[in-house]
Curated annotation (Swiss-Prot):
Protein name as it appears in the record: Glutamate-1-semialdehyde 2,1-aminomutase
Pathway this chain belongs to: Porphyrin-containing compound metabolism; protoporphyrin-IX biosynthesis; 5-aminolevulinate from L-glutamyl-tRNA(Glu): step 2/2
SUPFAM superfamilies, per the entry: PLP-dependent transferases
One Pfam match: Aminotran_3
Family affiliation: Belongs to the class-III pyridoxal-phosphate-dependent aminotransferase family. HemL subfamily.
GO biological process: one example: protoporphyrinogen IX biosynthetic process
Keyword Disulfide bond: no
Keywords from the named record: Cytoplasm, Isomerase, Porphyrin biosynthesis, Pyridoxal phosphate
Record-listed N6-(pyridoxal phosphate)lysine modification sites: 264
Cellular component terms (Gene Ontology): cytoplasm
Organism from which the protein derives: Clostridium acetobutylicum (strain ATCC 824 / DSM 792 / JCM 1419 / IAM 19013 / LMG 5710 / NBRC 13948 / NRRL B-527 / VKM B-1787 / 2291 / W)
Database matches in CDD domains: OAT_like
């Protein structure tokens, strides 16, 4: 079957033909390629066409596709069984590894997705503080939990949905919205709801309104405000954790959160998530404390093995991050040169190996409102051209591109050669 035939038949059985909205290419005039396999930095579709992968499964595949050490660990565990719904030594192995190699994670709880990690972290913060309100930032996406679907990024922004039908007003009445990189907007909320705010949750490197790194002074001030008001600071590092640095964005900024959420890379390509932080807070979780959270598949041994194999490679090879940053710098410089040559207004935002090309006339894109001013039609034209030419980029202006360990100088040069023909 061709890609088109598979996609058309998929629409009969899955809403939009996909299991996550952005995969449907709603903003593009092409159908999505149906991916069959991957190797290193390359993907292959059902028709045998090859692509250089700059999406990396939306972040997890930093080590490239079919990483042999991950596959070997997984195969070994599969011989023992798929899952038991019981404690295993593998979940201890991964939990201990994260707690001993990542700053500010004294205890950790495994879950099954980034959404589950963030919603659980917020529940824990509310239980610990005995307060209800949270502050999130316009354009930040923390998963599809009801309380987060207010001015959210990712597919919500791509499809220009203000929220989501099915979310009762009561689910979001305790969600307060501030502007990313704007301290004053946060101070206003703390002044108004001084003793009611349980937590501030933020992506320190936003990746779901396009890549927008936080300003360091902004995060420093958030830390001060949370400390002064006895609120919990939650870093959503589902995307940036183990990616922009092994210890995550918190290590780049030198700002200490109370709780951190993880997913994507920590599962080695398998469904996984986790949240961790100070013992004092984490001990409020059941069975030690009153805050209840559970999961049948949490701590699955196959996933734990894949996660451990992935994180160990990243931790033991810090030069990987230097290499990815070097490639990112080359790609960024090349894109800006093309922009200058062709007279195409754009802004490149990058944090190490996360990047977005904003087709935007502004000098800087630092917030949700800045990102929304981008030319989405121009981005669609760019994405269609790149994808049909074998460069697999996100189909949305508001999603991140990723570089990984297996990308090469030749991959970067090919990207730039194709973009020059836009």
């Amino acid at each position: 079957m061709t890609n088109k035939e598979i996609f058309e038949e998929s629409k009969e059985y899955m809403p939009g033909g996909v299991n996550s909205p952005v995969r449907a290419y709603m903003d593009l005039n092409i159908d999505p390629p149906i991916i069959k396999s991957g190797k290193d930095s390359h993907l292959f579709d059902e028709e045998g066409k090859e692509y250089i992968d700059f999406i990396e499964a939306w972040g997890p595949m930093i080590l490239g596709h079919k990483n042999q050490k991950v596959l070997n660990e997984v195969k070994e565990v599969l011989d023992e069984g798929v899952g038991f719904g019981a404690p295993t030594s593998l979940e201890l192995k991964l939990a201990k590894y994260i707690c001993t190699t990542v700053d500010n994670v004294e205890m950790i709880r495994m879950v099954n997705s980034g959404t589950e990690a963030t919603m659980s972290a917020v529940k824990l913060a509310r239980g610990y503080t005995k307060r209800d309100k949270i502050i999130k930032f316009a354009g930040c996406y923390h998963g599809h939990f009801d309380g987060f679907l207010v001015e959210a990024g990712s597919g919500v922004l791509t499809q220009n949905i203000p929220g989501s039908p099915g979310v009762p007003k009561g689910s979001i009445e305790n969600t307060l919205i501030a502007e990313y990189n704007n301290v004053e907007s946060v101070e206003v909320l703390f002044n108004k709801y001084k003793d009611e705010i349980a937590a501030v949750i933020i992506e320190p490197v936003a990746g779901n309104m396009g890549v927008i790194p936080a300003k360091k002074e902004f995060l420093v001030k958030l830390r001060e405000l949370c400390t002064e008001n006895q609120s919990i600071l939650i870093f959503d590092e589902v995307m940036s954790g183990f990616r922009v640095a092994y210890k995550g964005a918190q290590s780049l900024y030198g700002v200490t959160p109370d709780l951190i959420t993880f997913a994507k890379i920590m599962g080695g390509g398998f469904p996984c998530g986790a949240y961790g932080g100070k013992k004092e807070i984490m001990k409020q979780l059941s069975p030690l404390g009153p805050v209840y959270q559970a999961g049948t598949m949490s701590g699955n041994p196959v996933v734990m093995a894949a996660g451990y194999a992935s994180l160990r490679q990243l931790h033991e090879n810090p030069e990987y991050y230097t290499y990815m940053d070097k490639l990112g710098s080359k790609l960024e410089a090349g894109i800006l040169e093309i922009s200058k040559e062709k007279g195409i207004p754009l802004v490149v935002n990058r944090c190490v190996n996360m990047m977005t090309i904003f087709f935007n006339k502004a000098k800087e894109v630092k917030s949700y409102s800045d990102a929304k001013a981008s030319d989405t039609k121009m981005f669609a034209r760019f994405a269609e051209h790149m994808i049909t030419s074998g460069i697999y980029v996100p189909p949305s202006q508001f999603e991140a591109m990723f570089l990984g360990v297996k990308h090469t100088e030749e991959d970067i040069e090919r990207f730039l050669d194709v973009m020059k023909k836009l």
